[in-house]
């Protein structure tokens, strides 16, 4: 972002070629490849001992700040204090880190999705299924909602009628071998559920069924649609792509997949606004 030669990299595991390595988040200079900063995921401030970072951060270019959720249950708000010397080809950072932690009914949860932000409000879901809205000015919670299961998929976010709408979906992980995976539209200002859609999916200990990826929030000729991918539907191999009406959650079309997909679908548009 901003044209700065910085690379932001999170780890999902703590082993390389079978050998244990430190686990956390890295910032590298793309000028010389040197590591400029490391966040130790095994943070003593965290309620959770696992220190992976599966999601991407959001870089606030105006305020030179990185906002990053971790699987240790912390949200890191880091003022980078970047100094980029374009004449001599040097870049440095002096991070100042603030951390937010929380529990819900006595339980902590880690975040495996990327953070979604609108103005001063951040939105994320933990692996207990707790969707939370966070005030970034005060680092205090605004509201929370239980999605009923683990959520790896990053939220979709869209402005609508002077409010913020969130599109969220969960997996089938903690509720038995066969259960509904939910896709929901939620008012980002209040946490109120507008509608929900369910798709029966299978549990698999290796790769969970359900929604593991972000939806398409349609534009142009599909501006009325939000499109989700569900994995492991009728069995452990199959999947389903479903287009839902943004207004009411009704199915507009669906496509059964012979093999499931847990990547995010992508919409492409012509200059005339035709979608593919």
Name every feature range the model reports, one short phrase each.
Residues 16-22, 71, 124-127, 174-180, ...:
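Short, solvent-exposed loop/turn segments at conserved positions within beta-propeller repeat blades
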Residues 6-9, 65-68, 121-124, 132, ...:
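Conserved beta-propeller blade signature
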Residues 12, 53-55, 124-132, 136, ...:
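Internal alpha-helical scaffold/solenoid segments in large eukaryotic proteins
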Residues 4, 32, 62-63, 72, ...:
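Acidic/polar residues in short coil/turn loops that connect beta-strands
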Residues 29, 116, 121-123, 187-188, ...:
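Beta-propeller-forming repeat regions
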Residues 1-4, 10-15, 19, 37-59, ...:
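Extracytoplasmic beta-rich repeat domains
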Residues 30-32, 80-83, 135-139, 187-190, ...:
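Short loop/turn segments that connect beta-strands within beta-propeller blades
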């Amino acid at each position: 972002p901003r044209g700065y030669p910085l690379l932001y990299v999170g780890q999902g595991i703590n082993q390389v070629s079978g050998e244990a390595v430190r686990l956390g988040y890295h910032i590298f200079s793309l000028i010389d490849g040197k590591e400029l900063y490391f966040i130790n995921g095994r943070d003593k401030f965290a309620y959770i001992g696992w220190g992976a970072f599966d999601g991407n951060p959001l870089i606030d270019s105006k305020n030179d700040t990185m906002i990053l959720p971790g699987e240790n249950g912390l949200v890191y708000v880091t003022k980078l204090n970047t100094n980029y010397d374009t004449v001599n080809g040097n870049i440095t950072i002096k991070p100042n880190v603030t951390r937010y932690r929380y529990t819900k009914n006595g339980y902590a949860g880690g975040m495996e999705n990327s953070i979604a932000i609108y103005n001063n409000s951040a939105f994320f879901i933990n692996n207990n299924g707790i969707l939370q809205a966070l005030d970034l000015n005060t680092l205090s919670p605004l509201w929370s909602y239980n999605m009923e299961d683990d959520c790896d998929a990053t939220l979709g976010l869209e402005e609508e009628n002077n409010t913020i709408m969130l599109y969220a979906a969960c997996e089938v992980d903690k509720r038995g071998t066969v259960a509904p995976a939910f896709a929901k539209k939620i008012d980002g200002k209040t946490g109120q559920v507008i509608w929900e859609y369910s798709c029966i999916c299978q549990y698999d200990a290796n790769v969970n069924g359900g929604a593991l990826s972000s939806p398409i929030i349609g534009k142009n000729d599909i501006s009325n649609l939000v499109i989700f991918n569900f994995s492991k539907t009728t069995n452990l191999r199959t999947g389903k792509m479903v287009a839902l009406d943004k207004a009411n959650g009704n199915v507009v079309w669906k496509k059964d997949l012979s093999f499931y997909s847990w990547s995010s679908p992508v919409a492409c548009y012509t200059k005339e606004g035709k979608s593919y």
